[in-house]
């Protein structure tokens, strides 16, 4: 299966952003288009009270998006419901939980970008 593009997934903290930058630069070097960035664990949502806070910092995905001129595809929270559903064999979208909308929005952005991506069927990496 030919590689059409890469999606960078990072957390907003600086140490993770350094790894994400290495990934972006590697994909650029081997001419694999970076289709966008996803900020994982963007916020923490307390399972008891619903309070939301940014325990890993803020703006990391935005920074990468601006610095490398790639779209910010979305943000995903650090939420116990995501793990519980995955452990039960039902990812958020299949379970229809509150996080499903975030995953669907990201998937739709990637799907819209795919036809625009240049395809090189001769390469697999």
Q: What annotation goes with each model-predicted range?
A:
Residues 26-125:
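C-terminal lobe/tail of nucleotide-utilizing enzymes
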Residues 7, 23, 28:
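Ligand-binding clefts of soluble mixed alpha/beta catalytic domains
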Residues 14-17, 54-55:
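Active-site glycine- and acidic-residue-rich loops that bind
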